[in-house]
A protein has these predicted regions:
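ABC ATP-binding cassette signature C-motif
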Residues: 1-220
Length: 220
């Protein structure tokens, strides 16, 4: 049942700012966890570390042996330096014929005539929808999402939200979208330079809890 175990993790920004320290948590099966911090770089650093793209400044992490991850990074620029169309682009990332690829794109609200578009001319929102389709194609049991609601319009957020609420695996994510966090997350972990605040509650309850506000005041 072990999904991810993190022990004493620390990340320091290039300018010497401590993004987080003394971070310890265990993710349990099925949990959908939102990560918060006053410094948005903290979440990106955590996600990059647990994906093996960045070295932690201290501490360790261990994934469970049956876990497969799909990562939606904050910066997706490098994925789109090509003149492939949407269907050909998506086909690189998993098995399936053209009809299947169009199905994945359709679920992220791409119309029939849009799938012939070249990916290097897409808007920020369209790129994010492509990245979500790519992630769904990977069929992982743990999704790691760094601010996935960036650039998305309301309709796209709603479509994505509905997919995630029904998702049976684990989700580790960050977001600026209040409603999105509230409907997806069942656990909240706030990353600070002095450790974590870790609660099994809704986002609304978390931000209105007076004890948590007091605790938070001493941690930054």
């Amino acid at each position: 049942n072990q999904i991810l175990e993190v022990e004493n993790l620390k990340a320091v920004d290039a300018d010497g700012t401590v993004l987080f320290d003394h971070v310890n948590f265990n993710i349990e099966k099925g949990q959908k966890v939102v990560f918060l911090s006053r410094n948005p770089k903290a979440m990106t650093a955590l996600f990059e570390i647990i994906n093996g793209n960045r070295k932690a400044d201290a501490g360790t992490y261990n994934w469970g042996i049956t876990i497969t991850t799909a990562y939606l990074p904050l910066d997706n620029t490098d994925f789109f330096n090509t003149d492939k169309n949407l269907v050909d682009w998506l086909s690189q990332y998993g098995p399936g014929n053209e009809v299947a690829m169009k199905g994945f794109l359709g679920r992220m609200l791409f119309k029939q005539e849009e799938v012939e578009k070249k990916v290097n001319v897409l808007s920020g929102g369209e790129k994010m929808r492509c990245m979500i389709a790519r992630m769904q194609l990977q069929n992982a049991n743990c999704l790691i999402l760094d601010t996935p609601t960036n650039h998305l319009d309301l309709e796209s957020i709603q479509a994505f939200n509905n997919n995630l609420v029904g998702f049976k695996g684990n989700i580790l994510f960050s977001s600026h979208d209040h409603e999105f966090i509230n409907t997806v997350a069942d656990r909240i972990i706030e990353l600070t330079p002095k450790g974590t605040i870790d609660k099994l509650m809704t986002y609304d309850d978390y931000i209105h809890d007076e004890q948590i506000k007091e605790q938070k005041a001493g941690m930054y």
